[in-house]
Amino acid sequence: MFPLKKSLLLLFFLATINLSLCEQERNAEEERRDEPDERNAEVEKRFFPIVGKLLSGLLGK
């Protein structure tokens, strides 16, 4: 019974640390995206390739 409790406790702590690290990384990414110019650049990077693919599909190229 003791080894099972010990391994479950270890698993719990490792999962907690992992979630904490993920949350810190997500917060850092959100801070980087706070500037509107960077947000607009990201939208443009995602938008133009999609439009290009749609237009090339419609034009038959």
From Swiss-Prot:
What keywords were assigned to this record? Amidation, Amphibian defense peptide, Antibiotic, Antimicrobial, Cleavage on pair of basic residues, Fungicide, Immunity, Innate immunity, Secreted, Signal
For this chain, the family text in UniProt reads: Belongs to the frog skin active peptide (FSAP) family. Temporin subfamily.
Question: What highest taxon heads this organism's lineage?
Answer: Eukaryota
Per the UniProt entry, the propeptide covers 23-46
Localization recorded for this chain is: Secreted
Name the job this protein performs: Antimicrobial peptide with activity against Gram-positive and Gram-negative bacteria and against fungi. Has been tested against S.aureus (MIC=7.5 ug/mL), B.pumilus (MIC=7.5 ug/mL), B.cereus (MIC=75.0 ug/mL), E.coli (MIC=7.5 ug/mL), B.dysenteriae (MIC=20.0 ug/mL), A.cacoaceticus (MIC=60.0 ug/mL), P.aeruginosa (MIC=5.0 ug/mL) and C.albicans (MIC=5.0 ug/mL). Also shows a weak hemolytic activity.
A Pfam entry, by short name: FSAP_sig_propep
Q: What is this protein called?
A: Temporin-ALi
Species of the source? Amolops loloensis
Q: Where is the signal peptide?
A: 1-22
- Transmembrane region positions? none
Q: In which tissues is it expressed?
A: Expressed by the skin glands.
Q: Which GO terms describe its biological process?
A: defense response to bacterium; defense response to fungus; innate immune response; killing of cells of another organism
Q: Which residues carry this modification: Leucine amide?
A: 59
Q: Name one GO cellular component term.
A: extracellular region
